[in-house]
């Protein structure tokens, strides 16, 4: 099975990382509209926005509590997950990232040209 199928057939995704560079597992889970529990470390809070249940790292009790909370009110958390997918589409696509990178380069060049060197 591929990763998309595994996420899509899951009721909850749990990303309990102690550190994430970019956080592909978070983006993958959100892209598949799976209610997400993730640690509030590294880049994860920035990636998830308000579309995940964030917990402290190394807190297995929080994982249990968050899982029960999601499964007890699944429709609510599924709706959040659906909105989370839209968040990923709007904020983490190559066209947007490339444009932002391009703008940063242009602004840097402009600042350098305008500098009194």
Regions found by a protein language model. Give the residues of each.
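Short acidic alpha-helix that forms the nucleotide-activated donor recognition element
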Residues: 1-10, 31, 45
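Acidic donor-binding loop of glycosyltransferase active sites
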Residues: 8-21, 34-35
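Conserved acidic donor-binding loop of glycosyltransferase catalytic domains
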Residues: 17, 38-40, 46, 55-56, ...
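Short hydrophobic beta-strand element within catalytic cores of glycosyltransferases
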Residues: 26, 35-38
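Conserved acidic donor-binding segment of nucleotide-sugar-dependent glycosyltransferases
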Residues: 53-60, 69-74
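A short, well-ordered alpha-helix in the C-terminal region of glycosyltransferases
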Residues: 69, 76-91, 97-103
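C-terminal alpha-helical cap of glycosyltransferases
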Residues: 94-117
């Amino acid at each position: 099975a591929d990763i998309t199928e595994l996420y899509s057939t899951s009721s909850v995704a749990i990303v309990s990382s102690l550190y994430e560079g970019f956080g592909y597992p978070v983006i993958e889970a959100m892209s598949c509209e799976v209610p997400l529990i993730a640690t509030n470390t590294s880049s994860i809070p920035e990636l998830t926005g308000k579309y995940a249940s964030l917990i402290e790292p190394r807190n297995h009790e929080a994982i249990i509590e968050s899982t029960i909370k999601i499964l007890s009110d699944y429709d609510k958390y599924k709706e959040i997950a659906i909105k989370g997918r839209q968040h990923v589409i709007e904020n983490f696509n190559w066209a947007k990232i490339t444009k932002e990178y391009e703008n940063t380069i242009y602004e840097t060049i402009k600042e350098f040209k305008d500098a009194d060197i």
